[in-house]
């Protein structure tokens, strides 16, 4: 509502699913910051997710639901900022959430367990989208959707106990 009243204000969407608000004065920008103060509080909470299967007809999994459950689990576990990287989640192979270029990425899938098909995501690691260092992540395996928040909490606790941030820890523990 606030932006609707500002002449020439625009919201621009980027390829990584983030949004930029442009054509604001300094005071207007400060007001937008105030209105959005309940946003991301850590690097992990700036994670990227496509719109997901709840809206996208191509999407196999609800990537937004996964992201929200992961953020809640990491907040509840009080994982410190820097212990987990920004993750990228795509609900299908189309890669709208750029899962291959994240340090940790997930792509919507299904996994059969005891003859029953369950919602799952394929895990990718070590992708990079930094210009000059671009690389596609390595596909590691498939994790049930319900297990991903706990996987990230365990990883975050492990990294936090090392006293390092995720980047330093990952470089010291490449496997």
Please report, for each region that a protein language model flagged, where it lies by residue.
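Small-residue-enriched alpha-helical segments and adjacent helix-cap loops
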Residues: 1-115
């Amino acid at each position: 509502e606030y932006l609707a009243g500002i002449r020439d204000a625009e919201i621009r969407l980027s390829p990584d699913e983030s949004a930029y608000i442009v054509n604001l004065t300094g005071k207007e920008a400060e007001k937008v910051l105030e209105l959005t103060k309940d946003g991301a509080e850590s690097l992990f909470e700036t994670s990227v997710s496509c719109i997901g299967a709840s809206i996208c007809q191509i999407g196999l999994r609800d990537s937004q639901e996964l992201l929200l459950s992961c953020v809640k689990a990491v907040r509840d576990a009080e994982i410190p900022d820097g212990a987990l990287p920004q993750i990228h989640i795509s609900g299908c192979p189309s890669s709208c959430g750029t899962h291959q270029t994240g340090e940790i990425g997930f792509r919507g899938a299904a996994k059969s367990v005891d003859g029953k098909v369950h919602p799952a995501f394929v895990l990718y690691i070590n992708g990079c989208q930094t210009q000059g260092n671009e690389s596609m992540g390595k596909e590691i395996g498939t994790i049930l959707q319900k297990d991903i928040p706990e996987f990230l909490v365990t990883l975050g606790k492990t990294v936090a106990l090392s006293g390092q941030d995720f980047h330093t820890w990952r470089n010291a523990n490449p496997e």
